[in-house]
Amino acid sequence: MSRYLGSITKKSRRYGFSLLETEREFIKGKKRTYAPGQHGNKRVKLSGYGEQLQEKQKMMYLYGLNDRQFRRTFVIAKHMKGALTLNTFIALESRLDNLVYRMGFAPTRRAARQLVNHGHILLDGKKVTIPSCMVKLEQTIEVAPKSKDLPIVAAGASNTPCKFVDSDLKTKKGKYVRFPERDELPEGINEAYVVEWFNRLV
């Protein structure tokens, strides 16, 4: 399955969950805030399998991954010490593209991935073009000097950097200082269902 490149707003409505983490998709006055489709405003009771699949899909779309990438990230989480439920989130949050977004250097994860792909991001002073690169604690991330004035970078300044990163929005340089705690991560996802889903496959 390839990475989803369609409307994030539609997917947010489908799952009743803000994939942009801003609730912008559900602002009063929007044409539709319920799920897309002819019967989108009708709730359907899901089976246990359906609930697991839905939570997996929500997390996958939130971080902008395809199935293969998500499964690979889950395998990384399984080899980490601690609770697998939290480690699944930590592995996702430790991706380079996600941390570029968390530091306020890009307005969305999709934009952050684009910056990494095009060589605008440095990791410990070296250009890295792999969005899935797993960043270690205390590593530094910065926008390349020639890229700091890009509109897409300026747009990221509206994001408040998370507490688990040390970010300077003026110099466009930051550090991954600690792993996030559960209350610092997106609400509305049952990660236990995600773990149950992948445990059947991995």
Swiss-Prot record:
Domain S4 RNA-binding: 94-157
GO molecular function terms noted in the UniProt entry: rRNA binding; structural constituent of ribosome
Disulfide bond sites: none
InterPro entries associated with the record: Ribosomal_uS4, Ribosomal_uS4_bac-type, Ribosomal_uS4_CS, Ribosomal_uS4_N, S4_RNA-bd, S4_RNA-bd_sf
Source organism superkingdom: Bacteria
NCBIfam families: PRK05327.1, rpsD_bact
Assembly and interaction partners: Part of the 30S ribosomal subunit. Contacts protein S5. The interaction surface between S4 and S5 is involved in control of translational fidelity.
Function: One of the primary rRNA binding proteins, it binds directly to 16S rRNA where it nucleates assembly of the body of the 30S subunit. With S5 and S12 plays an important role in translational accuracy.
Name this polypeptide is given: Small ribosomal subunit protein uS4
Gene: rpsD
